[in-house]
Amino acid sequence: MVAATVAAAWLLLWAAACAQQEQDFYDFKAVNIRGKLVSLEKYRGSVSLVVNVASECGFTDQHYRALQQLQRDLGPHHFNVLAFPCNQFGQQEPDSNKEIESFARRTYSVSFPMFSKIAVTGTGAHPAFKYLAQTSGKEPTWNFWKYLVAPDGKVVGAWDPTVSVEEVRPQITALVRKLILLKREDL
């Protein structure tokens, strides 16, 4: 009886560990910039570039322009930039979500999804960013960290803000092309 109980407990622990290992980026939820809870599952099957953004950073202009161009060029082909404002680095995103959205849309005409301001590091970090940091081995240390997420939700690349969007673009484009070819084969 004791052996059966121990075996059952071990089996439950093993199953729980396996279930945790199966988690991916698209399993999380986040609040969008307008306050609505969104399942990131809606982006499954697409390539995503997840970025922690800030409005008052030295990297803001270069990154926002390049991210919007990337969204414009690749968005029609199962790709999304997913922007998460963050005020943890240099207090460079101090405004409200409404002001952040207004700034991004007015200044850069952003058309990519934006989410509510979050923490991306530390104990209060959003679970999706904890996942990105743990699976890539690279935790954000400043604004405009970029994580490339495959259609299956797995992280396939991570870059700090000194790496430009243009430098990352070939890897993103290759992943999008691969996805397009797979979708064509399914027809």
Curated annotation (Swiss-Prot):
Compartment(s) where it occurs, according to its Swiss-Prot or TrEMBL record: Secreted
E.C. code: 1.11.1.9
Signal peptide coordinates: 1-19
GO terms under biological process: cellular response to oxidative stress
InterPro entries according to UniProt: Glut_perox_Gpx7, Glutathione_peroxidase, GPX_AS, GPX_CS, Thioredoxin-like_sf
Expressed in which tissues: Expressed in esophageal epithelial cells; expression is up-regulated after exposure to acidic bile acids.
Function: It protects esophageal epithelia from hydrogen peroxide-induced oxidative stress. It suppresses acidic bile acid-induced reactive oxygen species (ROS) and protects against oxidative DNA damage and double-strand breaks.
Disease: Barrett esophagus: A condition characterized by a metaplastic change in which normal esophageal squamous epithelium is replaced by a columnar and intestinal-type epithelium. Patients with Barrett esophagus have an increased risk of esophageal adenocarcinoma. The main cause of Barrett esophagus is gastroesophageal reflux. The retrograde movement of acid and bile salts from the stomach into the esophagus causes prolonged injury to the esophageal epithelium and induces chronic esophagitis, which in turn is believed to trigger the pathologic changes.
Protein name as catalogued: Glutathione peroxidase 7
Annotated source species: Homo sapiens (Human)
Lineage of producing organism: Eukaryota, Metazoa, Chordata, Craniata, Vertebrata
